[in-house]
Swiss-Prot record:
This is Protein RepA. Belongs to the initiator RepB protein family. This protein is essential for plasmid replication; it is involved in copy control functions. GO terms for biological process: DNA replication initiation; plasmid maintenance. Keywords: DNA replication, Plasmid, Plasmid copy control. One of its GO terms (molecular function) is DNA-directed DNA polymerase activity. Disulfide bonds: none annotated.
Length: 288
């Protein structure tokens, strides 16, 4: 009989003995590196744009056991834009909820007040407006589709989402979540990082800087210079290139100001590059 894979199998460093857990709390969240690099959570655009560009992640197919076993080579992510201000916080809440209650099941229930706290929303703001915002974010996250196909021309496909079920029962004030076990491998040790949230908390409403932080946090030590073209792609901004570059420079400066980043910006030919000297998730780079 096939053994069901649950969240506890991938939130621990040792899946055999369930030892050395990766801590999920108000200052840390576990995030798949792929999610942080692909631009699933991006800043709100300056003008209306409900849908993000299709994200082709076919190059990751060799890392998915599910994709290899089923012969899927064409993998795409589509759906509404997920912002940093609310949607990313709700996603953090989802990860934390599963880290607490998904030990033996991929389907969990918890009180709305607890879920909102896990998302990082103050308890004193649990009003009708916040409930509506969280419910809308759950809908958007559930609607983010991941499609697996056996080649671009194949008519056979497997469609799933970032989460299988996201249900908020306003009558009982309960949130119900269910995950697709086929995607748990995204959280395996080689492909996940502990994202510390000090910078997110220090950048309220500064979505470009927040999104840039999550991308830079996913990079390995001593990364190569990063072109602004790559940063524009990751942030999925929709303004003119010149304006995008200005916005990116402002966000980089903000990360430097809060003590998260020591970096230089240089121009080579027609392109700008970010050169990272040091990163400090605890915002202590200026004191080091």
């Amino acid at each position: 009989m096939e053994t069901q894979l649950v969240i506890s199998d991938v939130l621990f460093g040792n899946t055999e003995e369930k030892q050395k857990p990766l801590t999920v709390n108000e200052l840390n969240t576990i995030q798949p590196v792929a999610f942080m690099r692909l631009g699933l959570f991006v800043p709100k655009p300056s003008r209306s744009s409900d849908y993000s560009p299709m994200i082709d992640v076919s190059e990751l197919s060799s890392t998915f056991e599910f994709a290899r076993l089923e012969g899927f080579t064409d993998i795409k992510i589509t759906g509404e834009r997920l912002d940093m201000d609310t949607d990313f916080k709700v996603w953090i809440g989802i990860v934390k909820a599963f880290s607490k209650y998904g030990i033996s099941s991929n389907r969990i229930k918890l009180k709305f007040s607890e879920f909102a706290k896990d998302c990082g929303f103050p308890g004193k703001k649990l009003d009708k407006k916040l409930r509506a915002h969280i419910d809308e974010s759950l809908r958007k996250i559930r609607g983010k589709s991941i499609s697996f196909k056996r080649g671009k021309d194949s008519q056979s496909a497997y469609h799933t989402g970032l989460i299988k079920i996201a249900y908020f029962n306003a009558d009982t004030d309960v949130v119900e979540l269910e995950a697709d076990e086929r995607l748990w491998e995204l959280y395996y040790f080689d492909y996940r990082v502990v994202l510390q949230l000090h910078a997110i908390k220090a950048l309220p409403r500064l979505e470009v800087a927040q999104a840039l932080y999550t991308f830079l946090a996913s990079l390995p030590s001593n990364p190569a210079p990063i072109s602004f073209e790559r940063l524009r792609e990751r942030l999925s901004l929709i303004s003119q290139v010149k304006e995008q570059n200005r916005i990116i420079k402002k966000a980089i400066t903000k990360l430097i100001d809060i003590g998260n980043l020591d970096a230089s910006m240089v121009k080579k030919g027609q392109e700008n590059y970010l050169i990272i000297h040091k990163r400090s998730p605890k915002l202590s780079v200026i004191n080091e």
